[in-house]
């Protein structure tokens, strides 16, 4: 499993202000374990390896991984 910004068919990650929205978006739409709002987009934790995710910088990924774990 992997973490990242899950993208829809148009290649965009859902934008967010609230983590509740992302939890639902990530778990119900993308079947991840959890979801959080990180840097204004929904960051999903526990996505299946075949899910498409947004290409992001290592620094941004490390930041979101750090924030979602703590």
UniProtKB/Swiss-Prot annotation:
Keywords carried by this UniProt record: Disulfide bond, Ion channel impairing toxin, Neurotoxin, Secreted, Toxin, Voltage-gated sodium channel impairing toxin
Reported tissue expression: Expressed by the venom gland.
Coiled-coil segments on the chain, per record: none
Biological process terms in GO annotation: defense response
One GO cellular component term noted in the UniProt record for this chain: extracellular region
InterPro entries with a match to the protein in the record: LCN-type_CS_alpha_beta_dom, Scorpion_toxin-like, Scorpion_toxin-like_sf, Scorpion_toxinL/defensin
Family according to the record: Belongs to the long (4 C-C) scorpion toxin superfamily. Sodium channel inhibitor family. Beta subfamily.
Domain free text: Has the structural arrangement of an alpha-helix connected to antiparallel beta-sheets by disulfide bonds (CS-alpha/beta).
Functional note: Excitatory insect beta-toxins induce a spastic paralysis. They bind voltage-independently at site-4 of sodium channels (Nav) and shift the voltage of activation toward more negative potentials thereby affecting sodium channel activation and promoting spontaneous and repetitive firing. In vivo, this toxin induces a fast excitatory contraction paralysis on fly larvae. It is active only on insects.
The name this protein goes by in its record: Beta-insect excitatory toxin LqqIT1
Source species of the chain: Leiurus quinquestriatus quinquestriatus (Egyptian scorpion)
């Amino acid at each position: 499993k992997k973490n990242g910004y899950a993208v829809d068919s148009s290649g965009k990650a859902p934008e967010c202000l609230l983590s509740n929205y992302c939890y639902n978006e990530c778990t119900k739409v993308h079947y991840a374990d959890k979801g959080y709002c990180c840097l204004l987009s929904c960051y999903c934790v526990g996505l299946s390896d075949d899910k498409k995710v947004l290409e992001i910088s290592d620094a941004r990924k490390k930041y979101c991984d750090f924030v979602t774990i703590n």
